[in-house]
């Protein structure tokens, strides 16, 4: 008897389910994607016990005939591709025909579907992949799929499920991503009878962002767009002042499909340059329209990994789209909001709430650049759980707390902003410059700086030898003197480093530099990089280099320490990129040679520093991404002293401090 046998269909489906159905959120993803492919405009997701007990997806799509409903439970039966050539021009979200049979093989599944309104429909009941019941029923147009007792026949998989709160967080994250990918579809998510998420389905992406991340977040998103012969990019990214501690808020879409791609994520950060603090990430929703021939989605069972042709060109297109859009905005952070961030840290724990978007209650007016709402249509805010700055472990508590507390806040609530103070304190550490990983992150942001329009400032005072005070047409400005000079010196060194033609000064007494044998050998291999920045070291004896001339931008008294610093930097950097090395060197030198805190400046020096800052391409952030200055407007001052009162009915002031 042959040792090799053909597996039964049920067993094969259960094996496939191990790849396709990792957790309840995987079921939600596959079924909702099928509903979207069916042309649905309204999709309702109902779950109980975070999907382990029940998942029900109801849509108003085109539905299925009785014959198609039966075939849908067979492996590799699909209506989305018919030939080999179709595999290379896929525009649907699903195409393999694996999801439904895989899910049915590990659950009790009920399908109720009809192709026309008021006509006869089909009811199918399957258990463990076997159809146990089929009958004709009356059903509205569309499909309702009920999945119960998930993993009932694969108990080993249940052992690896996390808490109900964690599984719910994964479901909400999937629904949020799909809502952003398809703002033209109205999504409703209900857990244990409570409405968790609701989008309007108007097709306005910014409105979908407001429904998912909150109105205050949507107001701080800016639109981007760019295109070439192969790609068309559109979407929204957050202002540099609105960031998160991880990449979970970056949503990349290709032809309506949510994907994960490290290089494209990196291109988003490159578009911000040094405007982002190190360790902080923007909120971004970027939709990429591409010829299906240039994207291969048949890579991974979840279809979230996509191979893209001309990926480098796409990265450049995304970076330039973001940098061009940021040029149009005033990037000086509002000081009053910064104060609110630190004063509300204890309030900043609950997961963000949002409005239930009931068309046409909330809409975005592009001409006025603001949201407007009809008071009669505002419902109570609903809890909206997203994986906000949390690992899987910490999400559990936040979701649990939010479920227990419910959503009882009124629409005129002031939303607490998220705190970035911890990241700022980290930047001040001098140990920071010794970290190769941190340096690499910095350089990725500093490759391109954009010119800016800087306000005219009139200096009038200094506090604690650290902060400069100035006034202008925009109100009061407070400047961090160390960050300001660091920015000035960075741009100076960034420009001067590498200008080797006719810019070398002979040393009357050459310098000798000794290194360990291993460092000496490494430096010899990378000597061309030092020469590119104007440092010409020659071997001179055992493990020793001699320097006979130095670049004129480096003062002679700084040569010895400066060259050692450059060599240390070169030894720290494994990549042999001249561009990156010059940027790293400029960061290091600007930080070490800038005035520190508790250093008193006279009026002339302070005014000169502000004049130099105004000439910078990016005067708003130091090379590490920290803000150089903050602004109190006249209105902010009047609010603090209660000279004017907030308009409690104004939607524009919602969430403002």
From Swiss-Prot:
Pfam families recorded: DNA_mis_repair (PF01119), HATPase_c_3 (PF13589), MutL_C (PF08676)
The record's annotation in SUPFAM superfamilies points to: ATPase domain of HSP90 chaperone/DNA topoisomerase II/histidine kinase, DNA mismatch repair protein MutL, Ribosomal protein S5 domain 2-like
GO annotation, cellular component aspect: mismatch repair complex
**Cross-referenced PROSITE patterns:** DNA_MISMATCH_REPAIR_1
Give GO BP annotations, semicolon-separated: mismatch repair
User: Which molecular function GO terms apply here?
Assistant: ATP binding; ATP hydrolysis activity; ATP-dependent DNA damage sensor activity; mismatched DNA binding
Recite the UniProt keywords alphabetically.
DNA damage, DNA repair
Query: Which residue stretches, if any, does this entry annotate as coiled coil?
Result: none
Q: Which InterPro entries does UniProt cross-reference here?
A: DNA_mismatch_repair_CS, DNA_mismatch_repair_MutL, DNA_mismatch_S5_2-like, HATPase_C_sf, MutL/Mlh/PMS, MutL/Mlh/Pms-like, MutL_C, MutL_C_dimsub
Which HAMAP family does the UniProt record give? DNA_mis_repair (MF_00149)
Family to which this protein belongs: Belongs to the DNA mismatch repair MutL/HexB family.
Protein role: This protein is involved in the repair of mismatches in DNA. It is required for dam-dependent methyl-directed DNA mismatch repair. May act as a 'molecular matchmaker', a protein that promotes the formation of a stable complex between two or more DNA-binding proteins in an ATP-dependent manner without itself being part of a final effector complex.
State the name under which the record lists this protein. DNA mismatch repair protein MutL
Identify the species of origin.
Streptococcus agalactiae serotype Ia (strain ATCC 27591 / A909 / CDC SS700)
């Amino acid at each position: 008897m042959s040792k090799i046998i053909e597996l039964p269909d049920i067993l094969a489906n259960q094996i496939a389910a191990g790849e396709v159905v990792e957790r309840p959120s995987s079921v939600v993803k596959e079924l909702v994607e099928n509903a979207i492919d069916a042309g649905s405009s309204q999709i309702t997701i109902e779950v109980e016990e975070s999907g382990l007990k029940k998942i029900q997806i109801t849509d108003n799509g085109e539905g299925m005939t009785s014959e198609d409903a039966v075939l849908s439970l067979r492996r590799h039966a699909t209506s989305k591709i018919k030939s080999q050539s179709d595999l290379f021009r896929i525009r649907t979200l699903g195409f393999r025909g694996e999801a439904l049979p895989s899910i049915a093989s590990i659950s009790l599944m009920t399908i109720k579907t009809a192709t026309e309104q008021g006509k006869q429909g089909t009811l199918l009941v399957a258990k463990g992949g076997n159809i146990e019941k089929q009958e004709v029923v009356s059903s509205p147009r569309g499909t309702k799929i009920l999945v119960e007792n998930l993993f009932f026949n694969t108990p080993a998989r249940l052992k690896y499920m996390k808490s109900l709160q964690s599984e719910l967080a994964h479901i909400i994250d999937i629904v949020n991503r799909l809502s952003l990918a398809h703002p033209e579809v109205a999504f409703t998510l209900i857990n244990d009878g409570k409405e968790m998420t609701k989008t309007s389905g108007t097709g306005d992406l910014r409105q979908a962002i407001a429904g998912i991340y909150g109105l205050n977040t949507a107001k701080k998103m800016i639109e981007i767009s760019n295109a070439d012969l192969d790609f068309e990019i559109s979407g929204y990214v957050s202002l540099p002042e609105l960031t998160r501690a991880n990449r979970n808020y970056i949503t990349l879409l290709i032809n309506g499909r949510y994907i994960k791609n490290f290089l494209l994520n990196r291109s988003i950060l490159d578009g911000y340059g040094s405007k982002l603090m190190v360790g902080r990430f923007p909120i971004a929703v970027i939709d990429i329209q591409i010829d299906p021939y240039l994207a291969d989605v048949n890579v991974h069972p979840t279809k979230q990994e996509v191979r893209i042709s001309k990926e480098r060109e796409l990265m450049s297109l995304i970076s330039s789209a973001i940098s061009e859009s940021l040029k149009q905005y005033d990037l000086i952070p509002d000081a009053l909001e910064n104060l609110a961030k630190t004063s509300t840290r204890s309030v900043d724990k609950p997961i963000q709430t949002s409005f239930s978007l009931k068309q046409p209650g909330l809409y975005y007016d592009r001409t006025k650049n603001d949201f407007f709402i009809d008071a009669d249509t505002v419902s109570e805010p609903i809890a909206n759980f997203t994986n906000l700055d949390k690992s899987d472990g910490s999400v559990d508590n936040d979701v649990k707390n939010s479920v227990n507390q419910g959503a009882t806040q009124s629409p005129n609530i002031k939303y607490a902003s998220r705190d970035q103070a911890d990241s700022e304190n980290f930047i001040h550490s001098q140990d920071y410059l010794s970290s190769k990983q941190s340096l690499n992150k910095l350089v990725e942001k500093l490759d391109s700086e954009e010119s800016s329009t800087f306000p005219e400032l009139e200096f009038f005072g200094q506090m604690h030898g650290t902060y400069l005070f100035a006034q202008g047409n925009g109100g009061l400005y407070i400047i961090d003197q160390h960050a300001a000079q660091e920015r000035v010196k960075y741009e100076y060194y960034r420009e001067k480093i590498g200008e080797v033609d006719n810019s070398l000064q002979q040393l009357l007494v050459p310098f000798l530099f000794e290194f360990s044998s291993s460092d000496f050998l490494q430096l010899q291999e990378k000597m061309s990089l030092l020469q590119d920045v104007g440092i010409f070291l020659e071997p001179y004896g055992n493990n020793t280099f001699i320097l006979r001339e130095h670049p004129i931008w480096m003062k002679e008294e700084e040569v010895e320490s400066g060259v050692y610093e450059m060599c240390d930097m070169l030894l720290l950097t494994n990549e042999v990129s001249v561009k990156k090395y010059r940027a790293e060197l400029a960061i290091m030198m600007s930080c070490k040679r800038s005035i520190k805190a508790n250093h008193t400046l006279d009026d002339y020096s302070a005014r000169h520093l502000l004049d130099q800052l105004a000439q910078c391409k990016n005067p708003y952030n130091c090379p590490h991404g920290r803000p150089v200055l903050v602004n109190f407007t006249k209105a902010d001052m009047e609010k603090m002293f209660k000279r004017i009162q907030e308009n409690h009915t104004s939607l524009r002031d919602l969430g403002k401090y």
